[in-house]
Amino acid sequence: MKNIYKAFVALAVTAGSLTTTSCIEETEPTSAASEEQVMQSEKSMASLLWGIPASLNLEDADGGHYRFGYGAIMHIRDIQTGDLLRYMYGQYNHFSNWAANKYQGRDYAYGQYIWNFSYKFVQTTNTLIRAINVETATDTEKGYLGAAYAFRAMAYLDLAREYEFLPNKVFPDGKNEDGNVVTGLTVPIVDENTTEQTAANNPRATREKMAEFILSDLNKAEELITNLTFSSKTLPHLDCVYGLKARYYMWLAGEDKQYYAQAAEYAQKAFKAAGISPMTSEDCLSKSKGFNDISKWMWGMQLVKENGAVQTGIVNWVSWMSNETTYGYAAAGPYVVMDANLYRQIPWDDFRKNEWTPTTFTTQDADVLAWFQKYACDLNNIYSRNNPDGILYQNMPVYTSFKFRPAQGNTVNSSIAGASAIPLMRVEEMYFIYAEALAHVNPAQGKAVLQSFMKKYRNANYTTDATTEEEVVNEIILQKRIELWGEGQTFFDIKRLNMSVTRGYSDPVKTNWLEQYRFNTDGRPSWMNWVIVQTEGNTNAAVNDYNNPDPSDTYKEWSED
């Protein structure tokens, strides 16, 4: 933690010198600031503000080509579920070890990247929060401050849900290797007031303390963010704060059902305040704009061709998530694919089924060829790792994703294709949170909300026989898993609801997971309690004996035999 603190102390000092009060004291002995000074201060604060969303897309190609920013962490969460797989072990698949549950302990570089990236992002928010005195700030600066609080709340809500130890069948008593019970412990809190001395002995916050801290940030964001005049969806606005509160209360409700009412309240506020409708079939299946258009979402990340990640060509979201590019990692073999059993549960009259290939490509079957002609970006692409003279689509396994299109549908020019958008929050998620939160209290009411959403926006013929709380909640989560596939959210639902991950099966369909990834868990997987890296313990003694137990290699591979 001291290392993280030192890395940003210079920036913090610089930012601190830019506060309105500081400017007044240096150049204006009286109590009034000139208009020019105020404008200069606001300009400086704006630079700090825009640095926050920009930092989400920072890549670290020298450390490994899986290090392409927040999108990579979203993808790691999905890799740890049973819904999304990469069709390769090792070689070009840099995410193999998360899927294979290997090297997840404190001494490995894989966890190091997540930890370092997350806390560096936290520090970008702390820098702006430290720089603005709300008592003397202009309305414009208050808007910036509200956005910073929202970003920080997002970061800590993620960290809390990733690192909080929850009991599982592998470690049912919550004890780690040192014999200490770590159930309910999250991560150390580093805020704008944390000193180097404090960081050296900063224990993991309890669930209760972390919840209090996050809610404080969210309440401040809710109060201040209406002053934000920038309309860019790379910044959070009031609808996003409501959305974060909905996620927050769902997290708390995992241990205390009384919070479901508040989750439902804020989810409804979020989709009403968003002022946008769920994506249509045309939006979702567009060859040029499918899931790369930030205007369709509440909140997202936006890359431009000047971004370092885009300029690398291959260390970015599109390289890893768009199977149709001729230059990226995905098309080189580690295709990103949907779980066979999940795909089976999508009916053909649900247009979302067409976000994944129904079969392997062939020109010999007219129906198959017609499907690819309708939904593929460019059947004329002549590239594949295994067959340089063949059509790219010939090597794709069944259930390959077409969901995340390269920007402008361009599959060959990395500087164009990589300038894409990545979803952080969609209005669809809020509808599913609303339905689930209601279902835990009144299953019939939650079911009615689900049916209304599905019939209106996804499948006019949708129906479900679910009636009990468990049945209705499971059906809502199923539809949410399909809807938000690849967007990094399913991990949190599986963990909080103590749901199993099933990758090995032969009925009613045969598994499409590689042997190295075929684990079946009984309840939440042990690997969803992420381990704090040793470098943190080296500088923050308080976490050393209170880390999560290492989940690596704690499950036996499923076999049909």
Language model features with spans:
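Bacterial Sec-dependent N-terminal signal peptides
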Residues: 1-31
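Membrane-proximal, proline-rich intrinsically disordered regions
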Residues: 19-75, 319-321, 331-336, 342-362, ...
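Short, surface-exposed recognition loops and adjoining beta-strand edges that mediate ligand/DNA contacts
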Residues: 35-36, 67-74, 163-183, 227-316, ...
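Hydrophobic-face positions in mid-chain alpha helices that act as interaction patches
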Residues: 67, 264-427, 483, 498, ...
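Conserved, well-structured interaction surfaces
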Residues: 90-165, 205-209, 220-229, 415-422, ...
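Inward-facing hydrophobic residues that define packing positions of alpha-helical scaffold repeats
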Residues: 122-125, 211, 218, 260, ...
